[in-house]
Amino acid sequence: MVRKRRTDAPSEGGEGSGSREAGPVSGGGRGSQRGGFQQGGGQHQGGRGYTPQPQQGGRGGRGYGQPPQQQQQYGGPQEYQGRGRGGPPHQGGRGGYGGGRGGGPSSGPPQRQSVPELHQATSPTYQAVSSQPTLSEVSPTQVPEPTVLAQQFEQLSVEQGAPSQAIQPIPSSSKAFKFPMRPGKGQSGKRCIVKANHFFAELPDKDLHHYDVTITPEVTSRGVNRAVMKQLVDNYRDSHLGSRLPAYDGRKSLYTAGPLPFNSKEFRINLLDEEVGAGGQRREREFKVVIKLVARADLHHLGMFLEGKQSDAPQEALQVLDIVLRELPTSRYIPVGRSFYSPDIGKKQSLGDGLESWRGFYQSIRPTQMGLSLNIDMSSTAFIEANPVIQFVCDLLNRDISSRPLSDADRVKIKKALRGVKVEVTHRGNMRRKYRISGLTAVATRELTFPVDERNTQKSVVEYFHETYGFRIQHTQLPCLQVGNSNRPNYLPMEVCKIVEGQRYSKRLNERQITALLKVTCQRPIDREKDILQTVQLNDYAKDNYAQEFGIKISTSLASVEARILPPPWLKYHESGREGTCLPQVGQWNMMNKKMINGGTVNNWICINFSRQVQDNLARTFCQELAQMCYVSGMAFNPEPVLPPVSARPEQVEKVLKTRYHDATSKLSQGKEIDLLIVILPDNNGSLYGDLKRICETELGIVSQCCLTKHVFKMSKQYMANVALKINVKVGGRNTVLVDALSRRIPLVSDRPTIIFGADVTHPHPGEDSSPSIAAVVASQDWPEITKYAGLVCAQAHRQELIQDLFKEWKDPQKGVVTGGMIKELLIAFRRSTGHKPLRIIFYRDGVSEGQFYQVLLYELDAIRKACASLEAGYQPPVTFVVVQKRHHTRLFAQNHNDRHSVDRSGNILPGTVVDSKICHPTEFDFYLCSHAGIQGTSRPAHYHVLWDENNFTADGLQSLTNNLCYTYARCTRSVSIVPPAYYAHLAAFRARFYMEPETSDSGSMASGSMARGGGMAGRSTRGPNVNAAVRPLPALKENVKRVMFYC
């Protein structure tokens, strides 16, 4: 997951204003479990019923954490005890896990509502989710014993409707799996036609043959393999290959349209090495190539699959066609994954630090409902500029390297950037030999000597170049490049080397480079469509010798696809605002005349300013304006801080945070806590953001809101309104709810208690070989509202895609076999916060590629089943498992870019556009949904693929649910591009990486963008989880932070 730039600014959204709630309230003892949420001087119609009449809500007292015994029973750490902070949504109390002690009539400002919290799970124990129990049997001063809680879970009534679906047994292997068939096509919404970047490919009627290729001596480079096979075809096509033009995958497989005149044959091929060896000579190498018939590639089954008469996709046949269509572009362009790049496809753009962006295109053959489809999209990536090495080093260090000696840090940076890079020498005229850099010399060139004879006579590199080549080295203070192996290294002065063109930069980009690359890739839909069509014309598949050889014909026009535009959902806000409900327009709305449905409380807050540009008086003004915006949006926000804003230097972040926190808490009366820390950051803040979040959330126990200097100076109302939304959910409030959820009108969600999960795994950046992956799982904790999400995060094995800690089982010396895990903890939390056990599970899983579908489903569905069974014998609620994919290359364009009724302001298709025909899977349950309005560039629809469905969703049911949930994202007044549970899981995992590796960031502003997944370009492992792998655990979150959505 590339990291986003680190700021805590919210996504862009609507403007916000409103007024504070006011009204009578009475309360005593414990709050009503099912009624409205009453606190302070206003009536918050929260909870499930949203009843108009005032409800009783007491001010809770001191809360208590779960005892150690309970923690061990359910996998939580023994230290899970602490002060309560906020009652559940259906209680009016301020209390702990056992509920607060009731007080008299409440007269103060509204107390903070609890919100499900995100926790950190470590193996083998977990920090259990903390939501207060709402069972009437629980004493307000005592939490239930583990056995009691388990009994309560079992005793929950299922009279609201037991699942009628038969629970399907999980197959033992992927071969037995059948993904759900499409339950018909959706009918809801306004019908329209869109264009997709899919091009119809006519299935060939040729006889395809598969041959195994063995090249000895074996090489790891596909480029060398291809060069060998090209030489073979050039030499022997007419004489030995029956005039066939084979397609080669660069490894072990060769395919032909029709048989070769032999079943097995050996060839000898001589090839001149492109690179110079350790002795300075280009070797001519002989390769033995054995080509042996393996099988015929059957296209009959592919035709049956495309017609829907066969459920399993014949992967080999698809692979053959993909290899055939990649042959010509592989010879013309530079292949990177499934994409091809060239300086001729588009204008190169500088990315800084010696890098530049190249334009290219993505190409992949796919089975669809319309038959075979060639998916083509534009792409860009970073290449190393083909400059002299001296110039590259100057660009990398951003200075003239002749002005002062290189520091140790400079040498490390240069070595890291140049290792593995191919260079050519320039001091020998037209003889441009190529070498690959293996390192830098430890000493300067002027100090470097080497033996020239058997008597170990030493000669300096400076002398050698002058005597041998007549070249006088100018930059003798610089180290030499080292090429060849460590046993027999060669030394090349930097100034005689030039970087060879066409080398992709695969290491991690810095913030400036990411910004520049995003700017290059950002294209308006009409421009992207034109470039895609131009690429198809440039590739000219009709004249592609390989396509002709195999009988593949590619259409030259974009596919026209039937689509529907789903209506936006009505949203519920607090009745005391002028507008109690809202219907979003084109995927967005604003907070004007509206108030948060449940405003949180900030009584005690402080501000720390780390920006030298922001003076104290400006910091005070900014905080006052922000407090006012929170107030008018529906929160109870004290306009005066506990202490005046203080300025500090970023390098003293830990000392300042702890000192200021101590000073502020000392000033408060006993039992009071700091509710919020407002932080002003420099625009370029390095690792400050990550350090600050780590200290606040794992050491001090305080939620924080970071604001960049540029926003402090602008002080725009829209920015303030968005920050208010984030602050509200961080302190336990809720911004809005779906009207259909309150009126129980969501199919297969509202009829019985339903829990919605979101899960994601973020991986380290390429090159970080030892850092763990971070898994996050969130789950809804309110029903029927489904807006609040608790979660768990854990570190797991490097690049492990399967979530290892979904279900855990281990032996305890006293208790014997103990079960725990993320799913179990979240199910228990749902039970505590709603009073119901989930009778239906919907699981949105982000970040899974098609090749991982079977492994992820087999492992994670099994973990869900085991977690449920560990809570109650026979407890198996029906599960729907949906993969959410954003890293695909399907783009949808309006049929007419000039029709204002079919595009949004950015020229993209309208939010709510759903496609489940033609370009979708021939038989399985999948769809593309563009749930958001575009801001800039071309919108990427999310692809949802149902891998398991025991709830028997209709197409309309799942599509509408997914689209409507996209309007409930807490951080902005816009619909978002992926379903919020998956989005929250990603945010949680991303935040947890700050705890794990705060020192690795070289730029701390976090901005929205496509680099959020952090290292997503590198491969992911689906090996079976190794529970014994040593993974450094995440530092524990503090109790005050656990109970709020601090990651928003």
Swiss-Prot record:
Its keywords, alphabetically, are: Cytoplasm, Developmental protein, Host-virus interaction, Magnesium, Manganese, Metal-binding, Phosphoprotein, Plant defense, Repressor, Ribonucleoprotein, RNA-binding, RNA-mediated gene silencing, Transcription, Transcription regulation, Translation regulation
State the tissue distribution. Answer: Widely expressed at low levels.
List the biased-composition ranges (Low complexity): 65-81, 165-174
Question: Where in the sequence is Phosphoserine found?
Answer: 1001
Which part of the chain is the PAZ domain? 388-501
CDD domains referenced in this protein's UniProt entry, alphabetically: PAZ_argonaute_like, Piwi_ago-like
Q: Name one GO cellular component term.
A: ribonucleoprotein complex
Q: Where is this region: Interaction with guide RNA?
A: 886-887, 932-940, 969-991
Database matches in InterPro entries: ArgoL1, ArgoL2, Argonaut_Gly-rich, Argonaute_Mid_dom, Argonaute_N, PAZ_dom, PAZ_dom_sf, Piwi
The UniProt entry, under Pfam families, shows: ArgoL1, ArgoL2, ArgoMid, ArgoN, Gly-rich_Ago1, PAZ, Piwi
Q: Indicate the principal place this protein occupies in or around the cell.
A: cytoplasm
Q: Which GO terms describe its biological process?
A: adaxial/abaxial pattern specification; adventitious root development; auxin metabolic process; cell differentiation; defense response to virus; innate immune response; leaf morphogenesis; leaf proximal/distal pattern formation
* Positions of region (Disordered): 1-143, 165-188, 1005-1025
Bias class Gly residues marks the residues at: 25-49, 83-106
Which positions bind a divalent metal cation?
760, 846, 986
Ranges of compositional bias, category Polar residues:
120-143
Role, per record:
Involved in RNA-mediated post-transcriptional gene silencing (PTGS). Main component of the RNA-induced silencing complex (RISC) that binds to a short guide RNA such as microRNA (miRNA) or small interfering RNA (siRNA). RISC uses the mature miRNA or siRNA as a guide for slicer-directed cleavage of homologous mRNAs to repress gene expression. Requires DRB1 for directional loading of the small RNA duplex (guide stand and passenger strand) onto RISC for passenger strand degradation.
Give the protein family. Answer: Belongs to the argonaute family. Ago subfamily.
Protein's recorded name = Protein argonaute 1
Organism per entry: Arabidopsis thaliana
Q: What is the lineage of its organism?
A: Eukaryota, Viridiplantae, Streptophyta, Embryophyta, Tracheophyta
